Amino acid sequence: MALKRINKELSDLARDPPAQCSAGPVGDDMFHWQATIMGPNDSPYQGGVFFLTIHFPTDYPFKPPKVAFTTRIYHPNINSNGSICLDILRSQWSPALTISKVLLSICSLLCDPNPDDPLVPEIARIYKTDRDKYNRISREWTQKYAM
């Protein structure tokens, strides 16, 4: 079941890739993918290329994939291990969701962080109290780690 669904998503991605994103299997393991997200133009991550790993559980799509950044990023909802705080990867997962939709949700999270549900409270505090500083550090990290 999982493999059939993963193969379908792969062909859908090839046919209709989401803007600024790409994803596909690492080697022959269909349950382990690498994804790429281009830093959105209207964000301090503009110009950066961010890599993520995607691990599908054997009971996918009934359980969400594990998605994590491998490129370091300065963001209140993404910690230094690359873990992403995004409701659809946890409690709000639905089998109707696809990797394409997950990647687009992560892109929109880059444009619009959610400082009220942070993984990194200190970055959330800076985002809320000193947006210029947040944008400056985000741009510095993007130049340092994602270019």
From Swiss-Prot:
Membrane topology value: Peripheral membrane protein
One of the record's GO molecular function terms: ubiquitin conjugating enzyme activity
UBC core domain sequence ranges: 1-147
Free-text description of this protein's post-translational modifications in UniProt: Phosphorylated by AURKB.
SMART domains: UBCc
Assembly information from the UniProt record: Interacts with SCF (SKP1-CUL1-F-box protein) E3 ubiquitin ligase complex; when Cullin is neddylated, the interaction between the E2 and the SCF complex is strengthened. Interacts with DAPK3. Interacts with BRCA1; the DNA damage checkpoint promotes the association with BRCA1 after ionizing radiation. Interacts non-covalently with ubiquitin. Interacts with E3 ubiquitin-protein ligase CBLC. Interacts with UBTD1. Interacts with RIGI and RNF135; involved in RIGI ubiquitination and activation.
This protein's name: Ubiquitin-conjugating enzyme E2 D3
Gene (name only): UBE2D3
